[in-house]
Amino acid sequence: MNLSAQLHETAANFTSKPAFIFMDRETSYTEFNHAVTQFADGLQSLGIKQGDNVALLLGNSPHFIIGLYSLFRIGATAIPVNPTYTPDEISYILKNGDVKAVIALDLLIPLFEKIDRILPSIEHYIICPSEVSERPVPEDLSISSKMKSFTSVILGGSGSLIEAETAEEDTAIILYTSGTTGKPKGAMLSYRNLYCNARDVADYLGINEHDRVITVLPMFHVFCLTVSLNAPLMNGGTLVIIPKFSPKEVFHVARKYDITLFAGVPTMFNYLLQYPEGKAEDFQSLRFCISGGSAMPIALLKNFEEKFNVIVSEGYGLSEAAPVTCFNPIDRPRKPGSIGKSIIHVENKVVNELGEEVPPGEVGELIVKGPNVMKGYYKLPEETAATIKDGWLYTGDLARMDDEGYFYIVDRKKDMVIVGGFNVYPREVEEVLFAHPDIAEVAVIGAPDPNLGEVIRCFVVSKQASLTEEELIDYCIERLAKYKVPKSIDFMEELPKNTTGKILRRALRNTVLQQS
């Protein structure tokens, strides 16, 4: 169940077919598999062995894919890290993750000089170019003796790679959560977790060797890893790698390469919808699009499908589940606002505070079971025990299921707002506001109130400078119960987002707390 072993088979079946395209350069499956073997051999020659933890601080590039699959091939554990994290965030993950080696962008060399003083246990820094051409590794730095270029590692192998014999429950990857409730936690995913979720996603969506997939979601994010990387690669598909999201580039690539599948977060779909030069003809080869990462407003989904004449299948997942648990069917009725039904081999159910399943239509916590559920959190047995009970992963998301087995995310459990004893789910208010023709983006949070405990506070990005707070509040009064109507509405140039484009409610909450 090691994806790197699967690559041998895929490369044998699709020898000259492009595995990925980057900067208009095609790399065949044979070339990809050979590069993985060479780099894995080079890593082994450096003393990196099965069970060692190795961090990847890279953007979307062939270096990431080759590095990841090389680590799988020698049985080392990969720790993908967002390279745009702050120095403190990166340092924490490298220390907590017991990292032995780092594969990273050359832009981070100054940071590693500082980190090496507090983490001398890191033995190797393998440097990848941030530009198209590779520059020589500096020789006058305090960590120069630990640094090697990506190319030199590929060329420095012994020529006699010993591939690891991994067990299906061995840890393949550690994904650090975004740390919305404190320090990031490392979700340990096994080879079985990764393989099964990629296989089941590919089966559910019908991904095959004829698919050409835009890979623009960050590769260090689990959504991209499974849907836009592992699933296509294990089935002979072709990745078209875009280093950084831009509507112009997505439309260009979709048209040039007859893209059949695009996966993104709702913010990306919103930008594509608003891009004035985007045309339905650009997406004419798309079989469908996939939305995940956060809830997609129903109005956005309908407007996108109508403008571009393409199906958008909304799904659901989380790092701890490798990540996918649900998708809206491609070949059967889809329900706007729903995350769809359980994918094959995965169970989802909604339970109350006692862990008892609730009837259809009733709101409770969504829990998940299947071969995709993580082993646990790295070095955190108590948090693991609180999250996984009797094999069920407690997601922290509030949901309901209808009579036909379709699930609906109501909101994050921690995001629910209690106004005078009444429960208000931010997404419900956001859906109402997003349907307003002059609203581009919206986020809703709870703000402290001395009388009601909490009140609803909204943050919006407007398409029209003339739009007023009073107008929007009146709009909400007509469509929402009184206790759900926003107490105030703030207009912003842009809402805070993480690197995948997900709106950060916690940043807005921090702003409110600082103001109070």
Which stretches of residues belong to each language-model region?
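Gly/Ser/Thr-rich phosphate-binding loop
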Residues: 259-264, 273-334, 347
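Structural core segment of the AMP-binding/adenylate-forming
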Residues: 8, 25, 45-46, 66, ...
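AMP-dependent adenylate-forming
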Residues: 5-28
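ANL superfamily AMP-binding
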Residues: 16-17, 31-55, 86-87, 91, ...
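Conserved pre-ATP/AMP-binding loop-to-beta segment of ANL
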Residues: 16, 126, 145-149, 154-176, ...
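Conserved AMP-binding A3 loop
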Residues: 28-30, 172-196
